[in-house]
A protein has these predicted regions:
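Central beta-strand plus flanking loop segment that forms part of the substrate or channel wall
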Residues: 60-61, 160, 165-196, 249-250, ...
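Beta1/beta-strand and adjacent pyrophosphate-binding region of the FAD-binding site
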Residues: 14-28
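C-terminal helical "tail/cap" subdomain of flavin- and related membrane-associated enzymes
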Residues: 306-393
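Active-site substrate-recognition segment that forms the wall
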Residues: 197-228
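Conserved N-terminal helical subregion
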Residues: 69, 78-166, 173-176
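Glycine-rich FAD pyrophosphate-binding loop
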Residues: 21, 25, 34-56
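N-terminal FAD cofactor-binding segment of flavoenzymes
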Residues: 52-84
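FAD/FMN-dependent oxidoreductases across multiple families
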Residues: 131-133, 227-304, 313
């Protein structure tokens, strides 16, 4: 993309040196870079992908808490107010919470928008630039293969972080393995709901989903895989065949496919070393229970950008020490992840899902701290914004 730099600006006194280099044009990486650039740092983002939004590996579903951290253009989203939770026998419950919603997104478009915003803040973005390693010499981080140096390096390069590997930092060791297909938008999918399927034969340790997305229908599932070297993979075709009675997906045009590991073991240790810090998926900032990480990418990406700026500009506290205190612990959710990974039998799920305790638990999982069951779904209301993707708001 011609609005992103291909090489350092030769007009700068030291064009190959930056205050901060961010590895990974991820949600966390771009938010951190934008924040640091707004605060006056000279920032570079490097990413091996050819352009922002390429090879996306996330469903891009935002919980309301994530939306509150970062304003996304409405034209790139679709609002969903409820969750329909299916038992293995295909009976279901509908869940809502007053004032709560999810946003399905056109994720590649969101990434392109966020990259433009980061560049507009003053950061230099280098796509097609692969991180191969770095060393810290005399309080300076050097990336010899890219002929770049920095005062600080931030690893936001995903679940299998090369930055973590090259500096001997903590690495993710527990994963879900996810697979998703984007289909053309189909009228057989009720747009009021995230459709979530519990089935420990087809999706042991997690679930399957059908999402009325922003201009598409997203269908996927993930399975608990423990160590990434294990052989278990999602049986996507079996899952689609199982749910076809509801959505008739086999005749729909496929627009895109994606797959990859989702860290679910909590925050890694150690997070940092001298002049180097991890954030986002690289740091394990993904809920072990729900596998959601964008909320944490927004919140802590912004915080990391601020803390690094204070450290470099004002003699502030070491960013690694600050974020080790501030990153979430995920204690209860880690235990719940281990319990669900044990894959309770489908017969038990069929019996338990419709009991008040299980419905209350599902309400808490989907709608955070907003307890209580809501039997009536919110009224649809027209929205003044002309959004070509939105079925309702």
């Amino acid at each position: 993309m011609n609005n992103f730099k291909k090489k350092p600006d030769p007009r700068h006194p030291n064009p190959h040196h930056y205050d901060l280099i961010v590895v990974g044009a991820s949600f966390a990486g771009l938010i951190a870079a934008r924040t640091a650039a707004h605060r006056g740092l000279r920032v570079a983002v490097i990413d091996a992908k050819s352009e922002p939004g390429a090879r996306v590996r996330t469903t891009g579903i935002l919980v309301k808490e994530a939306v509150e951290e970062c304003d996304i253009p409405a034209a790139l989203t679709r609002k969903i107010h409820g969750a329909r939770l299916y038992a293995p026998n295909h009976k279901h419950i509908d869940l809502f919470a007053p004032g709560y919603y999810f946003l399905a997104t056109d994720t590649p478009a969101v990434m392109r928008w966020l990259a433009r915003e980061t560049a507009r803040a003053g950061a230099d973005l280098f796509f097609g630039a692969r991180y191969t390693g770095a060393v810290v010499i005399d309080h300076q981080v050097r990336l010899p293969d890219l002929n770049l140096t920095a005062d600080y390096l931030l690893g936001a390069d995903g679940a299998k972080s090369r930055v973590a590997e090259s500096f001997g930092l903590g690495r993710n060791s527990e994963f879900l393995i996810g697979m998703e297909t984007e289909y053309e938008e189909t009228p057989t999918v009720d747009p009021d709901y995230l459709h979530c399927f519990l089935d420990t034969k087809l999706a042991p340790g997690y679930l399957g989903w059908v999402v009325p997305g922003a201009g598409m229908t997203q269908v996927g599932l993930a399975v608990s895989n423990g160590n990434f070297s294990a052989k278990r993979k999602p049986d996507y075709d079996a899952f689609v065949k199982n749910i076809d009675r509801h959505f008739a997906l086999w005749n729909c045009e496929v627009k895109a496919k994606r797959s990859g590991p989702i860290p679910c073991g909590g925050v890694v240790k150690p997070l940092s070393t001298h002049r180097v810090l991890l954030t986002g998926d690289a740091a394990g900032l993904v809920s072990p229970l729900t596998a959601g990480g964008i909320r944490f990418a927004f919140r802590y990406g912004r915080r990391v950008g601020a803390v690094i700026s204070e450290y470099l500009q004002d003699g502030g506290a070491d960013p690694g020490l600050v974020m080790a205190r501030e990153y979430p612990r995920f204690g209860l959710k880690t235990w719940m992840r281990r319990a669900w990974s044990a894959a309770p039998p489908n017969a038990l799920i069929n019996a338990a899902l419709f009991t008040p305790p299980m419905q209350a638990l599902a309400q808490w999982i989907y709608f955070q701290k907003r307890g209580g069951l809501v039997s009536e779904k919110p009224e649809r209301r027209p929205h003044n914004h002309q959004n070509p993707f939105r079925a309702f708001s």
